[in-house]
């Protein structure tokens, strides 16, 4: 009887730790994006001002930025086991990036979307990460 109650409690504790890990990683990524002296590619620090001087529809340019971002994030965030980076929107006044993240010790993928807005990166998802 004692063993059954212990098994019922363990997944909840594990899930809570996973949720905290996910929120921590997302918060740290957002902080990295908004750091003025970040080691991320300049597009990802300065966002729209730099993006507007490029051909936003150039798929090769988008692919290059995604590779640069992936490399920088994997270097700066050791809790990420695997990462895929995609542009959701890349237009003259809109820049949105989606990160598909697999964390160590977490079997479920985490999707984290970032949007350039009013001179900085933000994510409406940060409050909803679980």
UniProtKB/Swiss-Prot annotation:
This is Anti-adapter protein IraD. One of its GO terms (molecular function) is anti-sigma factor antagonist activity. GO terms for cellular component: cytoplasm. NCBIfam families: PRK14128.1-1, PRK14128.1-3. GO terms for biological process: cellular response to oxidative stress; DNA damage response. Interacts with RssB. SUPFAM superfamilies: gpW/gp25-like (SSF160719). InterPro entries: Anti-adapt_IraD, IraD/Gp25-like. The lineage of its organism: Bacteria, Pseudomonadati, Pseudomonadota, Gammaproteobacteria, Enterobacterales. Keywords: Cytoplasm, Stress response. It holds the Pfam family GPW_gp25. Inhibits RpoS proteolysis by regulating RssB activity, thereby increasing the stability of the sigma stress factor RpoS during oxidative stress. Its effect on RpoS stability is due to its interaction with RssB, which probably blocks the interaction of RssB with RpoS, and the consequent delivery of the RssB-RpoS complex to the ClpXP protein degradation pathway.
């Amino acid at each position: 009887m004692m063993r059954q109650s212990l098994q019922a409690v363990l997944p909840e504790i594990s899930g809570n730790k996973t949720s905290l890990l996910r929120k921590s990683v997302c918060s740290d990524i957002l902080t990295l994006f908004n750091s003025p002296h970040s080691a991320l590619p300049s597009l990802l620090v300065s966002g729209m001002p730099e993006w507007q001087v490029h051909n936003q529809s150039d798929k090769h340019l988008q692919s290059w930025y995604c590779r640069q971002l992936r490399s920088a994030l994997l270097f700066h965030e050791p809790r990420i086991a695997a990462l895929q980076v995609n542009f959701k929107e890349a237009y003259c006044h809109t820049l949105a990036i989606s990160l598909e993240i697999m964390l160590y010790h977490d079997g479920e993928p985490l999707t984290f979307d970032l949007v350039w807005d009013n001179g900085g990166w933000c994510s409406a998802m940060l409050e909803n990460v679980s």
